[in-house]
Every structure is written in structure tokens, then in C-alpha cells.
Amino acid sequence: MTNIRKSHPLAKIINESFIDLPAPSNISAWWNFGSLLGVCLIIQILTGLFLAMHYTSDTMTAFSSVTHICRDVNYGWIIRYIHANGASMFFICLFMHVGRGVYYGSFTFTETWNIGILLMFTVMATAFMGYVLPWGQMSFWGATVITNLLSAIPYIGTNLVEWIWGGFSVDKATLTRFFAFHFILPFIISALAAVHLLFLHETGSNNPSGVVXDSDKIPFHPYYTIKDILGLLLLTLVLMLLVLFSPDLLGDPDNYIPANPLNTPPHIKPEWYFLFAYAILRSIPNKLGGVLALVLSILILAIVPLLHTSKQRSMMFRPLSQCLFWLLVADLLTLTWIGGQPVEHPFITIGQLASILYFSIFLILMPISGIIENRLLKW
């Protein structure tokens, strides 16, 4: 008799995705972040659901309802802080996951990669709208500044912004629709993640060497399930350290001041995970140019497969490309730092140089290093 997990229609899908899935025998801890992102998404949906039970999406009561959750709801404070810091963990895992894809050449699975880019945009949109919901000073002004960027679109810009706002400024209509979108988007992300996995399982996973590993596969369970559980424990440890010891470490103190349209905060800045893109936006004096650079800072990932010139898939045996990759990481950290600084000398110049370097690495230096390494192989 066939095992039920191999015969039952539903169990069969789970079996082929998480149990009997043939996986390369040499994938490292960098391959853990996919499952960790799944865990983060589940944590965010569950904590978000409980927060939504007590939250009110009205400009008069939104701030008070968040305070009420923290003070009066049983364990409301921990649910709120798991949700807020869970978003930070989500982005840490996301950046590691994308970085792994760039380093080891996983982008050659173009369908999986493009769905991943779409997922990244959706997650960023969700996080942005979630940041608006507590209706603090940074929520209000962040929403005003970022939505206002759309007015840079020629001809339809102003109408588009007012359509998104639901009026002539960020107000009750904006908050209500942002709450509605923030609630529905995680479920869309779940569906996209399933499609992401579907495309991945068509080709099988990549591995650190970048070489086809069909001759040496092992079952996902128990080898990688146990490895994923270790990753999960470490994620939980870091998240709970954040939540229980310094829950506001990654937040902005201005968001504890209720939103006031008549008083602008001294430094308007988004959450830390958007600072690199915000720095690129600010480094271009022209509004439309800045918006284009902001979108391209993520969209540039879509042309990485087209600019892959090396004969080797992975960077494992390509020292020149490795140097460029770590230069890119350092550049992103620099941009993140600049995004949190005021717009004054020398930060403006550093931001502009870091932005130029960011695009140069992807568009010029990486393809050139691939060609040079191909030549070196012939020596």
C-alpha cells in the first residue's frame, strides 16, 4: 500500500515540496533564509490579525488605539512589538536572501528571480503602509512625503496623488485605505511566495558551486528540515532579544508623538530598511530623476541575469567579482547610514558618490569583471 503522503492529493503537494524534495547535498546556511522568510510572513500575519482586532483606522482614534493595545490588551505590548520588530527581521532575511541569490548566481532561474523581485516590491509596499497606521508624526509625514513623490510623474502625477490620498491631503480616507491594503497584501504575498516556490521546484535549488547537482541529491526531510529548525531558533532568539530588551531600538522616537499636520519633524526619514533607497532618492536634485532612481534601485535586480557575462554561475571561484560583491554590501551600508543623516555637507556628496557606485557595480563593473575572469581562465 502506498504511503498516504504520496497518494493523498493535498498531502502529495506538501510531500513533494517539503519532505521528499530532492535537494543539493552541499547547500549552506545561506539557503536557510527562504524558509525563514516564510516563518516571518506567518508571524506577521498572525500578530497582525490580533492587532487588527483592536486597531481603529480613524485619524481621531488610530494613535490612541495603538496605545490602548500596548496598555490595556492582554499581552498587547508583546504582540505589537513582535509585529514591529518582525518587520525588521523580515527585511534582514530578505536582504540576505537576495544577496545570496546575487552571490551564487541564483538569478539564472529567471522566473523564480522575477517573482522574487515582485515579492520584494509587494513586501516594501506593505511595510510602508504598515508604518503609516500608528498615526504618529513620522507615520503622517512619511506618508505625505513618499506618496507626494508620485506627483513627479508627468501630466497625471497630481491627479494620481490626490486619488491615492482620497482628498487634498493625507487624511482619514488615506489611513482607512492604507489599513485595508496593509491587511490584504500579506495574503497576496503568500500566494506569490507559493508561485515563487512552484517555479523553484521546476528547476531545483542552486548550490554554492553553481554546478548542476542532479547527480548528488538528498531528501529535504530530515536533512534540511532540521537545519531550517536551527535557523528558526536563531531567528526567534534575535527577535525576542529585540522585543524584550530594546523594542524601540529600530523605531523612531518621533512616532510616539501623535500626527500633527501643522508641525513638521526636524528629520523626516523612513524605517531603517528603506534608508538605502531613500538616500538614492535624495542624492538626485531633480524630483522625477530621484523617483526613477528610487524605483531602479530595486528594479536593477531584474537586469542582473542579462548582464551576467561570466562562464561560471557562482562567485565562489571568482575573486574579482567577490571583491565587487562585498564593495556593493559596504556601499549599501553606507547608503543606509546616509539615508538617516540630515541633508547637508558632507552627507549629500557621500550619498551621491555611493549612489553612483551602486549603479556602476551592477551596470558596469560586474559585467567587466565577468569578462576579465573569462579571459583569466584561458591563461
Swiss-Prot record:
Task: Indicate which residues the UniProt annotation says bind a ubiquinone.
Answer: H201
Taxonomically, which superkingdom? Eukaryota
Pfam families xref list: Cytochrom_B_C (PF00032), Cytochrome_B (PF00033)
The record lists heme b b566 as bound by H97, H196
Task: Determine if Cell inner membrane is one of this entry's keywords.
Answer: no
Question: Which terms does the UniProt entry file under GO BP?
Answer: mitochondrial electron transport, ubiquinol to cytochrome c
The keyword Transmembrane helix is assigned to this record = yes
Provide the primary localization.
mitochondrion
Record Gene3D superfamilies: Cytochrome Bc1 Complex, Chain C
Any note on cofactor binding? Binds 2 heme b groups non-covalently.
> Which cofactors?
heme b
Q: Which GO terms describe its cellular component?
A: mitochondrial inner membrane; respiratory chain complex III
Q: Spell out the InterPro entries in the cross-references.
A: Cyt_b/b6_C (IPR005798), Cyt_b/b6_C_sf (IPR036150), Cyt_b/b6_N (IPR005797), Cytb/b6-like_sf (IPR027387), Cytochrome_b (IPR030689), Cytochrome_b_C_euk/bac (IPR048260), Cytochrome_b_N_euk/bac (IPR048259), Di-haem_cyt_TM (IPR016174)
Q: How does it sit in the membrane?
A: Multi-pass membrane protein
Please state where this protein is localized. Mitochondrion inner membrane
Q: Which GO terms describe its molecular function?
A: metal ion binding; ubiquinol-cytochrome-c reductase activity
Biological role stated in the UniProt entry: Component of the ubiquinol-cytochrome c reductase complex (complex III or cytochrome b-c1 complex) that is part of the mitochondrial respiratory chain. The b-c1 complex mediates electron transfer from ubiquinol to cytochrome c. Contributes to the generation of a proton gradient across the mitochondrial membrane that is then used for ATP synthesis.
Add the further remark from the entry: Heme 1 (or BL or b562) is low-potential and absorbs at about 562 nm, and heme 2 (or BH or b566) is high-potential and absorbs at about 566 nm.
The annotated subunit structure for this chain is: The cytochrome bc1 complex contains 11 subunits: 3 respiratory subunits (MT-CYB, CYC1 and UQCRFS1), 2 core proteins (UQCRC1 and UQCRC2) and 6 low-molecular weight proteins (UQCRH/QCR6, UQCRB/QCR7, UQCRQ/QCR8, UQCR10/QCR9, UQCR11/QCR10 and a cleavage product of UQCRFS1). This cytochrome bc1 complex then forms a dimer.
Instruction: Return the similarity comment.
Output: Belongs to the cytochrome b family.
Q: What is this protein called?
A: Cytochrome b
